[in-house]
Amino acid sequence: MPFKIYKKYVMLLAFTAPALIFYAIFLLIPTISGMYYSFTDWNGLNPNYNFIGLGNFVESLKEDPDFLNSLWFTLKYVLVMIVLQNVLALVLAVLIESRTRSKGFFRTIFFMPNMISTIISAFMWTFVFSSVLPQIAEKTAIAFLGQSWLGDPKVSFFSIIIVSLWNGVGYMMIIYLASLQGVPQSLKEAAIIDGANAFQTLRSVTLPMITHAITICFFLTLNGAFKVYEVVYGLTGGGPGRSTQVITMNIYEEAFSNNFRYGYASAKSVILFAIVLIFTLIQLRVMKKREVEA
């Protein structure tokens, strides 16, 4: 091998090695270890453990109602977030893009909540739901605002959705805005000349041109919604009565609260990984197909 080519590969390895080492230590090795321990009864501390095969998986899917309830709640949360977050972000992006002078102001205002930590946002909204809204209801006689936003299982889900949207819509809006700026103005003008109204222009011209951004936003929303933890922990802690417990909270509880069943929690993590992988592959396949058609 010539010295120049050898030197080139050495330089590439020198620059990429630190990142690869950190990736292996903090992501690859823990992932492989978690998959291995999911087939054991390890408690996370004792070096002696037994290989139990698929026992943890069978127990979690057949004999653990708390896990199944948290899985169902998480799936419901994911579905609502995918729809609402992307629709709201796209609507805001279109409205802001249509403005000329105040575009920067509104872009900053709607993005600011994303700059606040999720757990801090949850604590802020806890105060709003438990103190501010009841006082407004008392002084204005609007009974709707005085309901138990965090204590009622039927209402607490919507409280979590509200805070999640408030915290995450701005980020998706920025992605859509960046994509909208790449849509040629001449195409919109041609559609208007042909008699298309604003909605028809959006549906037939704008949306096909930003399908790649929609794919990215759908993927980010799907990934983030399945991993949700802080907002639920800060608002309800999974209550009342575990009615708002998401799957990540159930896994954490199993690993560090319920007799330190680390192997059992690892099995649940593998199940979550498989579910996210399946949903992601389906979503990417559908969206990529639409990108090609567009």
Where do the model's predicted regions map?
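A structural signal for multi-pass alpha-helical bundles of membrane permease subunits
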Residues: 4-294
